[in-house]
């Protein structure tokens, strides 16, 4: 990709499925809307985008439609896409990241939405705990970072 300047690339240990195509444009600072819905916005990054995408199937069974936004660039954050989507989904937003919410995507999205009215905000992330070592699947389960938990938090958000 064309970018003059420093960058940080974070990858997962395990292989993950593709939910985008090789033809999809990736522009630094521009989010990708994977799916559009009307009940809530799910903002995810990295492998969490895959888990959130899987959670959409659970939500569909409950007649909930969600917009899924893939944030491949946290800084600069595509505030415009996030804010526009949250406004169109009744102010409901769920942020998903497999990292500490402090200083990460959760905090960046919260900051972007601070001046918006009537926001219902929730996060699936690691909440300021000491890290552990282990297999990826075991760690995700231990921290509640699962498609089931994403769907559960989304349902709670829609019911508020």
Protein language model regions, located:
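Internal gly/pro-rich beta-alpha loop/helix module
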Residues: 1
């Amino acid at each position: 990709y064309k970018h003059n300047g420093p960058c940080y690339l974070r990858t997962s240990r395990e292989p993950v499925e593709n939910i985008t195509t090789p033809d999809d444009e990736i522009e630094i600072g521009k989010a990708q809307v994977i799916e559009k819905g009307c009940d809530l916005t799910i903002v995810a990054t990295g492998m969490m985008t895959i888990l959130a995408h899987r959670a959409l199937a659970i939500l569909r069974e409950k007649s909930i439609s969600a917009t899924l936004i893939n944030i491949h660039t946290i800084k600069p954050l595509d505030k415009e896409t996030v804010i526009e989507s949250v406004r169109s989904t009744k102010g409901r937003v769920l942020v998903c990241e497999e990292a500490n919410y402090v200083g990460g995507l959760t905090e960046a999205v919260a900051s972007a939405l601070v001046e918006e009215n009537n926001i219902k905000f929730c996060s699936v992330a690691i909440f300021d705990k000491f890290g552990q070592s282990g297999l990826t699947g075991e760690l995700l389960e231990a921290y509640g970072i699962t498609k089931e938990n994403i769907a559960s938090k989304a349902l709670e958000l829609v019911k508020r």
